[in-house]
């Protein structure tokens, strides 16, 4: 009843279609007041506060800017160097693009959070949060695609055939279609507008059932990826001893590290989301600090390019070339030759299919161990 006195206009519209309320700014205030169990005074203070960016937010804006630049470097490296024009590296490029999107989405989230949240319409709020979910979904699906590609490469299953490139890009496209669909479910209609009792405390316009569904889907996918990698390791261990020193095995170790870092960074955030589905704000005060856990998860997007750089000699060289071209390093490279695509006779296809390509020079030149 108190809520209705404060927001009489909302109570009159509560029986209307949820889509007709997508541009009602009052709706945001009602959902935050109810889901976060705030008093009217607390809500008013948050709306009227002139909060500037905190030092922590400024730090994460800097980190996200680094994330964008790092992953842009990965994309440029994959595009320029013919050695990286293989299924594996295109999937890594896809992961880099999702990380770049995550960095951009988090910057937007920082600038649209705090008191600014209450000046958003529901549709703007759904776009703000949905973009972050799309980036997360794309990362998870990219990791699944990489695991499938590694399994195919190790077991030498011939599934690509003559249409290898076409099928590879179809798989990447499917990753993004599924990600956009998953992140767009709330704005399509799976939200808690007109049903305040089901609202998430962390994401007050999303229903708890959607949060539970997303976390369940991600958990199943990550478990499937772990099973695939366990299967791959068993195959490698039982194969010829030489395989453990091959570039393909080094590549396998790198993507396993990427998976492990992803799980470590995102596990606290997933735990908070699961807690949110079964616990009210006053019963679980830790939900008030959910932003810290999501900030920690964002670090995953900054670590992936560092893993590629530390694990791959070719990737390090390519990063240095791009930095030289941008004038950040003095390498004495002629400017007109800076962005010329590099050609290489070796590729990860040669590394992966060692038994099919016995040419010694090719194997000696193949130093990519991402």
Swiss-Prot record:
Q: Where in the cell is it found?
A: Cell membrane
Q: Which GO terms describe its cellular component?
A: cytoplasm; plasma membrane
What Pfam family is a match, any one?
7tm_1
Enumerate the Cytoplasmic topological stretches. 79-87, 150-167, 231-254, 311-370
This chain is glycosylated at: 24
User: What GO annotations for molecular function exist for this entry?
Assistant: sphingosine-1-phosphate receptor activity
Q: Alphabetically list the UniProt keywords.
A: Cell membrane, Disease variant, G-protein coupled receptor, Glycoprotein, Lipoprotein, Membrane, Palmitate, Receptor, Transducer, Transmembrane, Transmembrane helix
The residue ranges for the Extracellular side of the membrane come to: 1-57, 109-128, 194-219, 276-289
Which PROSITE patterns does the protein's record reference? G_PROTEIN_RECEP_F1_1, G_PROTEIN_RECEP_F1_2
GO biological process terms, semicolon-separated: adenylate cyclase-activating G protein-coupled receptor signaling pathway; anterior lateral line neuromast development; anterior lateral line neuromast hair cell development; cardioblast migration to the midline involved in heart rudiment formation; cell migration involved in gastrulation; cell migration involved in heart development; cell migration to the midline involved in heart development; convergent extension
The membrane topology term of the UniProt record is: Multi-pass membrane protein
Q: Where is the lipid attached (S-palmitoyl cysteine)?
A: 325
This protein's major location comes to: membrane
**What InterPro entries does its record include?**
GPCR_Rhodpsn (IPR000276), GPCR_Rhodpsn_7TM (IPR017452), S1P_rcpt (IPR004061)
Regions that span the bilayer: 58-78, 88-108, 129-149, 168-193, 220-230, 255-275, 290-310
Q: Into which family does the record put it?
A: Belongs to the G-protein coupled receptor 1 family.
Cited function? Receptor for the lysosphingolipid sphingosine 1-phosphate (S1P). S1P receptor is critical for cell migration and epithelial integrity during vertebrate embryogenesis. Receptor for the chemokine-like protein FAM19A5. Mediates the inhibitory effect of FAM19A5 on vascular smooth muscle cell proliferation and migration.
Disease as annotated in the protein's UniProt record: Defects in s1pr2 are a cause of heart development abnormality named miles apart (mil). In all vertebrates, the myocardial progenitors involute early during gastrulation and come to occupy bilateral positions in the anterior lateral plate mesoderm (LPM). During somitogenesis, these cells undergo a second phase of migration toward the midline and fuse to form the definitive heart tube. Defects in S1PR2 disrupt this process, leading to the formation of two laterally positioned hearts (cardia bifida).
Q: What is this protein called?
A: Sphingosine 1-phosphate receptor 2
Originating species? Danio rerio
Species lineage: Eukaryota, Metazoa, Chordata, Craniata, Vertebrata
């Amino acid at each position: 009843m108190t809520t209705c006195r404060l927001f009489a206009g909302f109570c009159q519209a509560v029986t209307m279609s949820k889509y007709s309320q997508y541009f009602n700014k009052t709706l945001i205030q009602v959902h935050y007041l109810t889901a976060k169990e705030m008093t009217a005074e607390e809500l008013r203070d948050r709306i009227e506060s002139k909060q500037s960016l905190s030092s922590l937010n400024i730090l994460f804006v800097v980190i996200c800017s680094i994330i964008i630049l790092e992953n842009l470097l990965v994309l440029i490296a994959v595009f320029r160097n013919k050695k990286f024009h293989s299924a594996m590296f295109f999937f890594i490029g896809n992961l880099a693009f999702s990380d770049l999107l995550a960095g951009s989405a988090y910057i937007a989230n920082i600038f649209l959070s705090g008191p600014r949240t209450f000046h958003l319409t529901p549709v703007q709020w759904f776009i703000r949060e949905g973009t972050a979910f799309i980036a997360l979904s794309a990362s998870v699906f990219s990791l699944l695609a990489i695991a499938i590609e590694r399994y195919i490469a190790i077991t030498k299953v011939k599934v690509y055939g003559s249409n290898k490139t076409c099928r590879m890009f179809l798989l990447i496209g499917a990753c993004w279609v599924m990600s956009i669909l998953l992140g767009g479910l709330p704005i399509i209609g799976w939200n808690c507008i007109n049903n305040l009792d089901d609202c998430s405390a962390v994401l007050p316009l999303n229903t708890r059932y959607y949060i539970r569904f997303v976390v369940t889907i991600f958990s199943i996918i990550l478990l499937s990826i772990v099973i695939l990698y366990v299967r791959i390791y068993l195959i490698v261990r039982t194969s010829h001893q030489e395989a453990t020193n091959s570039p393909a095995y080094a590549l396998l170790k790198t993507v396993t590290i990427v998976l492990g870092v992803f799980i470590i960074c995102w596990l606290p955030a997933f735990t908070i989301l699961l807690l949110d589905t079964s616990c009210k704000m006053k019963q679980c005060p830790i939900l008030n600090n959910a932003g810290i856990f999501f900030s920690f998860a964002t670090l995953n997007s900054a670590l992936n390019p560092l893993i590629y750089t530390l694990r791959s000699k070719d990737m390090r060289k390519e990063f240095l070339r791009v930095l030289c071209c941008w004038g950040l390093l003095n390498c004495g490279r002629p400017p007109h030759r800076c962005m010329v695509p590099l050609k290489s006779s070796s590729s990860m296809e040669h590394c992966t299919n060692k038994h099919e390509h016995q040419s010694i020079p090719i194997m000696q030149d193949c130093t990519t161990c991402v």
